[in-house]
Amino acid sequence: MELGCWTQLGLTFLQLLLISSLPREYTVINEACPGAEWNIMCRECCEYDQIECVCPGKREVVGYTIPCCRNEENECDSCLIHPGCTIFENCKSCRNGSWGGTLDDFYVKGFYCAECRAGWYGGDCMRCGQVLRAPKGQILLESYPLNAHCEWTIHAKPGFVIQLRFVMLSLEFDYMCQYDYVEVRDGDNRDGQIIKRVCGNERPAPIQSIGSSLHVLFHSDGSKNFDGFHAIYEEITACSSSPCFHDGTCVLDKAGSYKCACLAGYTGQRCENLLEERNCSDPGGPVNGYQKITGGPGLINGRHAKIGTVVSFFCNNSYVLSGNEKRTCQQNGEWSGKQPICIKACREPKISDLVRRRVLPMQVQSRETPLHQLYSAAFSKQKLQSAPTKKPALPFGDLPMGYQHLHTQLQYECISPFYRRLGSSRRTCLRTGKWSGRAPSCIPICGKIENITAPKTQGLRWPWQAAIYRRTSGVHDGSLHKGAWFLVCSGALVNERTVVVAAHCVTDLGKVTMIKTADLKVVLGKFYRDDDRDEKTIQSLQISAIILHPNYDPILLDADIAILKLLDKARISTRVQPICLAASRDLSTSFQESHITVAGWNVLADVRSPGFKNDTLRSGVVSVVDSLLCEEQHEDHGIPVSVTDNMFCASWEPTAPSDICTAETGGIAAVSFPGRASPEPRWHLMGLVSWSYDKTCSHRLSTAFTKVLPFKDWIERNMK
């Protein structure tokens, strides 16, 4: 395939040569063709096509004409290989060519650009670099394409050196500067000694040659491009940079090098040493940081520190100091400790006590791009493995506690199997000093009981079942005394601080007046009806607030629902877990066809009964009864009732075993089906026992429940 492309390209060039050698009297064979040149390229060409592009400089539409011929499918195929819009990539101003509906030979003659970007030249603006001999000048490269290579050689007069200063630098950053970079060497070719290699956008200090020539190389790889760079240069003598300290005099010799004549009391090649007393030279601030004198006598002449001077070091934003924060000038003229460095790092994100964090071993992360796929298809495995790839720089330097190196990965998981994670499971320290992904958190898994089916629910511990107790205020009756607690209802735990309960359980009968929170409490993990038989694992929690639904009707018991906010969080365990809230769309079958499990304690049980000690949490299966049939059923027994949209009626399911009398429990109703967070079956809260007229538990009359589905949004708003 590649050979065919090169053959076609070669033929195209041959055709172009033939065009230039045509005699003037050449007559067009096909008068419908755009011109003689097109006829030579495609003998039967009678049409042309236009390539539409955008000029990068001014963003106007440009283009050019190419000959084309109709194929068997009546499509116009190009008669020659053309480069598409890449010919305009480095243009600052483009020639409009044919993009206006007229015929031309724009592409054939190759007038691509009216003006190139600064630093680029040639018909396609892809050439760069030159030899510079002026005493001063500039090197400007405005933007750059992928895989660019440019070389400049600067020559100075004998006895002079060259000083190069970067005015602007915008290249891809890397600690090793191995992708996009400017490399400065002493001498006039690439074999000279490297003085400096720069990348990123931080301008280096002025660069000075050793001899009278300087070689500048720019290189870009095939992944990213930035704005380029701008540098100025000038010829100077070795003394131009004032290399002598302490007012020493710089003297040039015949070879162009220099010597320093020092004042009394100073010595050294650059007069840098003080003879009169010991002191410490300025340690300088770390790269990407700075220093401050925070103690002691300070500096001498701004360059040396007296004995006892304390210097503190600081880093710029998103950098962290590694090493000694302070250094002191000692009696021997040396600084204490080691010079610190500033490292790009990320502060560890805060997590809750429910989340466990683990630092993963440092490893190279790879990304597969379309270029990798191209290499995989075009080259052998051996050649592909030898192709250069980018690797992140290895971390260096120790960081203070609470910080992590660039590219460090943190893995998160919940500390307990009863919780599930929200947010990212893995986060990476980015170059910006921030972490990828979202902050993790752990919330309790709702509605999960292992290996439980609806027909086998008797004698089970339902971990979301909450026992609601009220404090007595009347005189004792033989079994209760003033101030004692007695069980009044069951509620459902929906998160660590929220219990959903029927509103009539926490209000005065027939009123909307709420019972004082001090006279109510919630017990979780309870199983036996007798409080004396409860295990030590139960949790007795105080209530901080009662939220009554605003539409609660204490007469009809419409909107019979309330929320209890717990003062302390419930401790999630095998015995205490929340139940899920369901939405209508979550039900796989219609609500009327659902088999619902009801659970609760017999709140009317006689404490003096022989079986009271062994009475436990009861459960059974009920079926939903049509609201109209429920009303007619009660009317047949002389009890007129109204079943609202916020209620549903249910009666005992004769095919399923049951040990519960729903009229005596004040319990909760739940259904098991797969949830949105997990395909595994989860139990969802569907209702709360509201009212019943079946005094004998004969199952002749249905029990009315508060339907939880219409109140889902209201519950979730108050769960936060």
From Swiss-Prot:
Residues 278-344, 387-444 form the Sushi domain. The keyword Signal applies. Induction: Strongly down-regulated in muscle cell lines derived from biopsies of 5 Duchenne muscular dystrophy (DMD) patients compared to a normal muscle cell line. GO terms for cellular component: extracellular region. It holds the Pfam family Trypsin. The gene is PAMR1. It is found in: Secreted. GO terms for molecular function: calcium ion binding. Residues 445-720 form the Peptidase S1 domain. Glycans are attached at residue 614. SMART domains: CCP (SM00032), CUB (SM00042), EGF (SM00181), EGF_CA (SM00179), Tryp_SPc (SM00020). Belongs to the peptidase S1 family. Disulfide bonds join 128-150, 177-199, 239-250, 244-260, 262-271, 280-329, 315-342, 414-442, 489-505, 630-649, 661-697. Residues 1-21 form the signal peptide. Transmembrane segments: none annotated. InterPro entries: CUB_dom (IPR000859), EGF-like_Ca-bd_dom (IPR001881), EGF-like_dom (IPR000742), Peptidase_S1_PA (IPR009003), Peptidase_S1_PA_chymotrypsin (IPR043504), Peptidase_S1A (IPR001314), Serine_Protease_S1-Domain (IPR051659), Sperma_CUB_dom_sf (IPR035914). May play a role in regeneration of skeletal muscle. Residues 235-272 form the EGF-like domain. CDD domains: CCP (cd00033), CUB (cd00041), EGF_CA (cd00054), Tryp_SPc (cd00190). Residues 128-236 form the CUB domain. This is Inactive serine protease PAMR1. PANTHER family: INACTIVE SERINE PROTEASE PAMR1 (PTHR24254:SF9), PROTHROMBIN (PTHR24254). Its main location: secreted. Keywords: Disulfide bond, EGF-like domain, Glycoprotein, Repeat, Secreted, Serine protease homolog, Signal, Sushi.
